[in-house]
Amino acid sequence: MPHRAPRRFMKTAPGACDWEQCLLMGSGEPTRARAVVSSSHKQRKPRQEISACLKWLVFLLNSIVFLVGVGILALGVYLFIKDFREVKLVDIILNPAILISIFGFSICVVSFFGFMGALRDNIFLLKCFAACVFLSYILVVAVTLVFFTLFYTDTTEGLSANWLLLYAVKNYHTNRNLAEIMDALQENLECCGVSSIAQGYRDWNMSYQFNCTNSNPQPEKCGVPFSCCRKSVISEAAGSSNPLLPAMRSLECWQNALTKRPGDLEHDIYTRGCLQPLRTLFESHAVHVGAFVALLIVPVCISVCLTNILAKQVDHQRYLLEREARRNDRRRKRDHNRRDQLNSLDLLEEGKFNNASANATRPRPPDIPPPLPPIEHVPRKKSRNASSSPTRKPKSAGVENAAARRKRTATTTRTPPAAAGPAPTPQATTTNRTHQWVLQQTDLVPQKSKS
C-alpha cells in the first residue's frame, strides 16, 4: 500500500476546495463553508524593500545641511540689514551679504528636497535633490574655470582680471561695494592701482573722483584712496603725543599723489599695482582650489548615488504595493463569486425542500389503471368451402361488391386507437361477440381458418 502524505503537507489546487470545505458544502452548512473560504485567503503584506538605515541616513545628513543653510541665510540677512545700502543688479555679485544670503538659501532648498523626499518616500523630491546637487557641482566647476581664465589671461581687452580691476577703479565713486572691494585689496596686498609694477598708483587718474583734469570739481582731485597709504605712516603718527597728528598725516599721504614722482611717494603710499600681487596670490593657492574642487566630487557622487538607490527602492516598494492591491481586488472578486455560488446553492436547496414538502402534503389520486388499447381486427380473405346444402345458391357479383364497400366503410369509420374510450364491460364484450357471429354468418367478415 503506497505511503500517504499527512494532511498538513497536502496541497490543493488554487481553484479547488479543501476536503473540510467540500464536506461542509455537501453537508448543508453553507454559512460555515463561507467562513472557511473567506478565512483561507489572508491579507499578506508585501516585503519591505526600503532600507531603513539608508532612509534615515539620508534624512539626518540633509537635516544637518539644512540647519547649516539656515544659519548661513540668517547671517547674510543680518549683514544686509545691518549695513543696508541701495541694491543694483551688479550688487548681487559684489555685495557679500547678498552672496551669503543666496548661498544659504540654495543650501536650504536643496537639503529640503533631500530630507523631505527621504521622510515622505517621495520619488520626485529625491530626484530633484540629486539633480540639484549635481548641477551645483557643475556650477562650482564652472566658476573655478572662470577664475583660472581670469588670472591666467594677459589680454587687456575682454574679460580678465586686469579689465575687472580697471572697471573697479573707474566706478570707485559710484558703487560702494566696488569701493570696499578695492580698499580691501589695496590694504591687504599693499598695492595701489592696477597694472604697473612701479607706477600703479597713476591708474587712479582714470577715476572721476581722483583725476587731475581741470574739469574735476572734487576735493580729492589728483589724489589716491586712503587705502593706498602705508600702514607704517599711520602707526607712527598714532604713537605721537599729538592727537591730531594721525589725521593730518593720513591726509598728507594721499593728497596730490598723482602729481608727485614715485621716488617721493615710496615712504607714504604703495606705488605698485594690485594685478601682479593678486595673480601671485591666486597662483599660490591654485593647487589647493583645484584639489578642493576635485575632491568635492566624492561627497557629491555619494549623495547622488544614495539618493538614487533610495528612490529606486521607493519605486519598487510602490510597485509591490500596487501589485498586492491588484491581487487583493482579484481575491475579493473571487470570494464574492464564491459567495454568490454558495447563495445560489442555498436557494436551490431551499427550493428542493419546499417542493418535497409540498408534494408530501398534496393528496394522492386513486390508483386507476391506464385504459387498454382497442383490439384491432385485421380482416383476412379466406376461401370458404362450398356449401353442401343444395338449396343455397352462390352469391352474385353485385352482392360481393356491396359487401366489399361495406367493409371499406366500416374500416374508415372505425375509431382510432388514440381516441378509444374506456375499457369495455363484460356485457359490451358479449354483444360484440354476437355481432361478430352475425357478420360471419352473412359473409361480411371472413371466418377464421380451422387448423
UniProtKB/Swiss-Prot annotation:
**Keywords, sorted A to Z:** Cell membrane, Cytoplasmic vesicle, Endosome, Glycoprotein, Membrane, Transmembrane, Transmembrane helix
Extracellular side: which ranges?
A: 78-96, 152-285
Localisation: Cell membrane; Cytoplasmic vesicle membrane; Endosome membrane; Early endosome membrane
Presence of keyword Cell membrane: yes
Q: Where is this motif: Basolateral membrane targeting?
A: 20-24
* PANTHER family per record: TETRASPANIN, TETRASPANIN-14
Q: Spell out the GO cellular component terms annotated for this protein, sorted alphabetically and separated by semicolons.
A: apical plasma membrane; basolateral plasma membrane; early endosome membrane; late endosome membrane; plasma membrane; recycling endosome membrane
In which tissues has expression of this protein been reported? Expressed in the germline, particularly in sperm cells.
Alphabetical list of Pfam families matching this protein:
Tetraspanin
Cross-referenced InterPro entries, in alphabetical order?
Tetraspanin/Peripherin (IPR018499), Tetraspanin_EC2_sf (IPR008952)
Look up the domain of life of the source. Eukaryota
- What molecular function does GO assign, one term? protease binding
Question: Whose protein is this, by species?
Answer: Caenorhabditis elegans
The UniProt regions of compositional bias labelled Pro residues, in chain numbering, are: 366-376
- The name on file for this protein is Tetraspanin-14
Knockout phenotype, as recorded, reads: Viable and fertile. No effect on sup-17 localization in embryos. No effect on tsp-12 protein levels or subcellular localization. In a tsp-12 (ok236, ok269 or jj300) mutant background, exhibits vulva morphogenesis defects resulting in vulvaless or protruding vulva phenotype, impaired egg-laying with severe maternal effect embryonic lethality, smaller body size and reduced RAD-SMAD reporter expression, a reporter system for the sma-6/daf-4 BMP-like pathway. Males have severe tail defects including crumpled spicules, fused and shortened sensory rays and smaller fans.
Residue segments, region Disordered: 328-451
Q: Which family does it belong to?
A: Belongs to the tetraspanin (TM4SF) family.
Positions of glycan attachment:
N205, N211
Function comment:
Functions redundantly with tsp-12 to regulate cell surface levels of the BMP type II receptor daf-4 (but not BMP type I receptor sma-6), probably by regulating endosomal sorting and recycling of receptors, preventing their targeting to degradative lysosomes. Together with tsp-12, regulates cell fate specification in the postembryonic mesodermal M lineage, body size, male development and vulva development, probably by positively modulating BMP-like Sma/Mab signaling. Together with tsp-12 involved in maintaining the structural and functional integrity of the endosomal network.
Q: Which GO terms describe its biological process?
A: nematode male tail tip morphogenesis; positive regulation of BMP signaling pathway; positive regulation of egg-laying behavior; positive regulation of embryonic development; positive regulation of vulval development; regulation of mesodermal cell fate specification
